[in-house]
Structures are given as structure tokens and as C-alpha cells.
Amino acid sequence: MSSRSPDELLRIEGIRKTFPGVVALDSVDFDLRRGEVHVLLGENGAGKSTLIKMLSGAYTPDAGRILAGGEEVRIHGAQDSERLGIATIYQEFNLVPDLTVAENIFLGRQPRRLGMIDRKRMDADAEVLLKRVGVNVSPRARVRELGIARLQMVEIAKALSLDARVLIMDEPTAVLTSEEVDKLFAIVRRLREDGVGIVFITHHLEEIAALGDRVTVIRDGRSVGQVPASTPEDELVRLMVGRSIEQQYPRERTDAGEALLKVEGLTRDGVFHDVGFEVRAGEVVGIAGLVGAGRTEVVRAVFGADPYDAGTVHVAGAPLRRHDVNAAMAAGIGLVPEDRKGQGLVLDASVEENLGLVTLRSTARAGLVDLKGQHTAAERIAGQLGVRMAGLGQHVRTLSGGNQQKVVIGKWLLANTKVLILDEPTRGIDVGAKVEIYQLINELTAAGAAVLMISSDLPEVLGMSDRVVVMAQGRVAGELTAEQATQDAVMALAVSTHTGNSPHSGGTDGTEASRGH
């Protein structure tokens, strides 16, 4: 790496970290200067989280060294990290819900007067910090009363209370609205002007040019390049995944076969009305629409998770009993839900146990689980999907987002699913892992399965769908072939003023285009 700059706050040289069966980091170099935003970029599982845990004291390196202000340091815990002026804001906030904002900011460091906590001074000091980060919230408010964006500002205020010279932000925009992202960026720029060095981890390539100064790319646990933030996105993608992605949405179309899923007249009062569509073998049908269009509600009803009042669902020509998940699964329908962590996985169970969730009962012999058979099948499917893990016994919670999603899809592959419903299949997944999910979709349809996909990423819907069903206000506004489906054509249907089932009718919804359900 380059010789030390006088503005250098932090330097990592040749860091290596291993866990049983896994080399998490190998010969990683990184440096941070005063008053800059240095973006740390890499796929899920590349080693970014391990690196920031080194700097926050959660892990210690097996080899290499960390320098702060030019001096080699050893960080053995959070106190060492704080003493060096390093503060980390993780995706899951480190705040106590039942304490006030001020109590959280100064937790363990409350100002005292005559042996008692000086609440007046603590609240006043907290107010100064909150104003500095531009958030209008009372220091006496309970943290549990705050939304995500304000919680994040409290975390930043807490970091500033430690006189942090280095601020590490792990995917800070992941759950923010576009307006909240703009406010966060304004605060980050202000901190940069104040001389704070910021390590900014993001999946969103468009955020790099908007906010960053330099980018270090990590791939497979190694630092593979350090480039200016103005570097074109195509080059960043090539560095990140180790190959050029010529086609972002590599759909491999096959001839469609028989209708495996047929929905007619599906109605749930006040939610969706007279919804009809079909998905044929070898086909991907995307459902597009605006926020509140009813897309997720419809597919949950098809899967039997939610009730409906009228209409029919047929799988491979046979009628499906309504509001019966077991019947849907037995008929060959699988659902990969939007909330994979809350609904699609048992986070504290192993990869093997999660892969066997759907097939546990069907593979039992005389009422006993066939553990050997389950293990063999899980091993086969994990290998087929390319799940990056230490072994089948690894807890799913510790996998990256892309690998978690592969496990959710894998459990349905084990069950030989005929119709797979994907709700936000690539949300929170980096660009390399997205392509791997798209290839899985191709493999499914090549094998004769039918795929029904909802996504708030309209280019993804257009790029991967053979046909696009557009919904508006709980109705089908129209249907487009892959050739007809452009962004303008989809949005014209999604915001048109009349609804119905003709290919060019539509509905209204005064909300954000292509994001939500």
C-alpha cells in the first residue's frame, strides 16, 4: 500500500483471520484518512463484517497488524476500540429500548454530581449531540418510541459522545426511505467536514459516487483493489465478483408447457378483486405494481397462508383447497417469503435442519425421521446451490444474506416443487449473489417448474420475466409479454385510471413506483 499520509487515522496491513474450516480474511490491507468517506465494498460473505469486528474489538487478527495514528495497536475489546476513537454502528442497533435517548447515549458514562447521576447535564449534553446530527428528538424520549431513522441518528450521536475520530457504518441505508437516506448523507458529509474518518459499507453502487471518496473492494476474504469513488459501476462490479457481468439479468427462456398454476376470479373483500393469471411450466411470470397494489396479499392467498372470499386456484389442473398451506405444499407450491429471516428460516437451526423443513414429514419412515437420507439430500442441494458455509451444521443466522436465500430456495428444491413463488427474491443481496439466484431460477424453469415472482426492483421484473402481470388497487391492470414489457408500459398500466383484465387497462395508486406490494 502507499506510504503513510499525515492525515491517516487508521491502517490495516496484511490482516488474516480464520475460523474452523473457513479463511475469513487473508492479507487484507485498508487505510482511512481524516475527513474522508472510505467505502468498503464486497459481496455478502466477502469478509467485510469480519474486518469491522476486528476494528471494534469483537475479533482479534491471527496475523497482520492494525495501526492508529501511525502506531501499532492491539484491540482486544470494545473499550480498546473506544479509547482509540473508533465507533461502530451495526445494522442491528446496540440500544436499550426501555432507556431514554440520553441514557443510551451516555450508557456507562453518565455525568455525576455528588455521587448521583446528573440528569440535567446528561440531557443537555445529549441535546447538543442530537442537534449536531440534525435530529429533532427529545433526550428524554424512550428509545422504543423511535423509528429506524431516528434510532440510527441516536447511534451516531452516541458515537460522537465518545469523541470518535473513526466512524464505521455497516449498511446504514438498508432500511431507510429515500428521504431518510438524503438526511443521513447530509450528516455524513457534515461529519466528514469536521474531520471524522468514515468507513461506509454499502451494497448500493449508486451511493458510492454520491458519498464516497475512495473504495476498497474485498473479494473472498482478500482486498483486491483500491479505486476512486468515481470508478464506473461496471468496473466496481467486476472487482467485486471477479468477473464481468455482461448481462445483469441472465434469463434463459424455454418453451412454455402446460399451465401449472391457474388463478381465476380471486377475491378478498377490501384487499384484492377478481384476480386472474396463469403460470406455465418453464415460465417466469413477474407481478409488478405500486405500493398497496395487493401483490403479496394475492400470492399469500394462493399459497393458503391467507384466506380469500371467492375464486379458484388450480395446480396442474387440479383444484386447490383454499386457506390450507399443507394442501398447497402437497400440490407442489412453494413460497419464498419477503421476510426470509422472520418467515422463511429458523435462524438458530443449522443449514441441514432448514433445508429439511419442508420434506421432514414426507421422508419419514414408520413415523421416524430418516436422518441419513435427510443429510445426503441436504448435502446434495447445498452443493448444487453453492451455499458458502463451514458445513451443514453451521447455524443459518451466521450465513450471509445471499446464502440464507439459497437455503430458503433449497428447501423447496428438495421438495420437488412444481410452482415456486418468490416474493422479493434478491432484496438485501449483493449484485454477485443476485446473479446466482437468477441462475437458480433458470435451472428451475429448465427443469419444468413454474416461477411466479414479485419484486420491488422493476428492472429485475422486466429482465427475468417471460410475462409481466401488472396490478393496481388489488386488481389485474393488464398483462405484457417480455417484448411488450418496458418500464414505461408497466408504469402506464400501474397508474392508469380504469381497472380490469384487458391487456391495456389499469388502476390508480398514488404511491412510489415499483417499490412495495
Swiss-Prot record:
ATP binds at G42, E43, N44, G45, A46, G47, K48, S49. It is an enzyme of class 7 (translocase). PROSITE patterns: ABC_TRANSPORTER_1 (PS00211), ABC_TRANSPORTER_2 (PS50893), RBSA (PS51254). It is found in: Cell membrane. Its EC number is 7.5.2.7. GO terms for molecular function: ABC-type D-ribose transporter activity; ATP binding; ATP hydrolysis activity. Keywords: ATP-binding, Cell membrane, Membrane, Nucleotide-binding, Repeat, Sugar transport, Translocase, Transport. Pfam families: ABC_tran. Gene3D superfamilies: P-loop containing nucleotide triphosphate hydrolases (3.40.50.300). It catalyses: D-ribose(out) + ATP + H2O = D-ribose(in) + ADP + phosphate + H(+). This is Ribose import ATP-binding protein RbsA 2. The lineage of its organism: Bacteria, Bacillati, Actinomycetota, Actinomycetes, Kitasatosporales.
